[in-house]
């Protein structure tokens, strides 16, 4: 779908996401980590752009999300916000709070959430976890900072669980996740990411809570969907889980373009006369 980059649509807010849930309008969310990609996503009609701590993997080359720092997250967030502002300024921008930026205490979490919000013009922060972060979520939302929750597979706890397998298959774990979803809503979270959980459980959570659910590997019954931009564009050829649909093969496109450039340079075919001054 082609969209007019000059079209000024209302900025997506937490209220708008609630309206979308109530009206049955699906929410489209993608990650971005840089200015150029954010411009394209905003122009393309993406509702929510997540500056995810997945930048640790796909941008910095780490094996997990744990090494990324709050300073690095803010750096990428600033670039994304500038990209959105350069286009239609429609997309909501949500920033992941990185590992150990909110786990030590509610006071430190509040300080770091405030730093993220003050250092760039983002719309909200995202935090992983259930009951263990509920008090912190309430503390942060009470001062006016919107928080998106994240349940199911929570990558910041990968060493605790030991794998990236589907979560909450067993009844006890499913019941706990459902309770956590309700607790997060009561604490003031405006939306929930549900990652790698059974589709029927995601549907139950979506029916139970009044806030939007955004799935990744959680079936089609969620109020919206999110993917890592590198995965859906085919930039990460080694990673192709069941829940990722590839909409392009940019790895191949970039490879062909670069090898073509290298050949032209080595053969003396670039630059041509009309590419010179």
Swiss-Prot record:
<comment type="function">
    <text>Catalyzes the reversible reaction in which hydroxymethyl group from 5,10-methylenetetrahydrofolate is transferred onto alpha-ketoisovalerate to form ketopantoate.</text>
</comment>
<dbReference type="InterPro" id="IPR003700">
    <property type="entry name" value="Pantoate_hydroxy_MeTrfase"/>
</dbReference>
<feature type="binding site">
    <location>
        <position position="128"/>
    </location>
    <ligand>
        <name>Mg(2+)</name>
    </ligand>
</feature>
<dbReference type="GO" id="GO:0005737">
    <property type="term" value="C:cytoplasm"/>
</dbReference>
<feature type="binding site">
    <location>
        <position position="126"/>
    </location>
    <ligand>
        <name>3-methyl-2-oxobutanoate</name>
    </ligand>
</feature>
<comment type="subunit">
    <text>Homodecamer; pentamer of dimers.</text>
</comment>
<feature type="binding site">
    <location>
        <position position="96"/>
    </location>
    <ligand>
        <name>Mg(2+)</name>
    </ligand>
</feature>
<dbReference type="InterPro" id="IPR015813">
    <property type="entry name" value="Pyrv/PenolPyrv_kinase-like_dom"/>
</dbReference>
<feature type="active site" description="Proton acceptor">
    <location>
        <position position="195"/>
    </location>
</feature>
<keyword id="KW-0460">Magnesium</keyword>
<feature type="binding site">
    <location>
        <position position="53"/>
    </location>
    <ligand>
        <name>Mg(2+)</name>
    </ligand>
</feature>
<keyword id="KW-0808">Transferase</keyword>
<feature type="binding site">
    <location>
        <begin position="53"/>
        <end position="54"/>
    </location>
    <ligand>
        <name>3-methyl-2-oxobutanoate</name>
    </ligand>
</feature>
<keyword id="KW-0963">Cytoplasm</keyword>
<dbReference type="InterPro" id="IPR040442">
    <property type="entry name" value="Pyrv_kinase-like_dom_sf"/>
</dbReference>
<protein>
    <recommendedName>
        <fullName>3-methyl-2-oxobutanoate hydroxymethyltransferase</fullName>
        <ecNumber>2.1.2.11</ecNumber>
    </recommendedName>
</protein>
<dbReference type="GO" id="GO:0015940">
    <property type="term" value="P:pantothenate biosynthetic process"/>
</dbReference>
<dbReference type="GO" id="GO:0003864">
    <property type="term" value="F:3-methyl-2-oxobutanoate hydroxymethyltransferase activity"/>
</dbReference>
<feature type="binding site">
    <location>
        <position position="96"/>
    </location>
    <ligand>
        <name>3-methyl-2-oxobutanoate</name>
    </ligand>
</feature>
<keyword id="KW-0566">Pantothenate biosynthesis</keyword>
<dbReference type="GO" id="GO:0000287">
    <property type="term" value="F:magnesium ion binding"/>
</dbReference>
<comment type="pathway">
    <text>Cofactor biosynthesis; (R)-pantothenate biosynthesis; (R)-pantoate from 3-methyl-2-oxobutanoate: step 1/2.</text>
</comment>
<comment type="similarity">
    <text>Belongs to the PanB family.</text>
</comment>
<keyword id="KW-0479">Metal-binding</keyword>
<dbReference type="Pfam" id="PF02548">
    <property type="entry name" value="Pantoate_transf"/>
</dbReference>
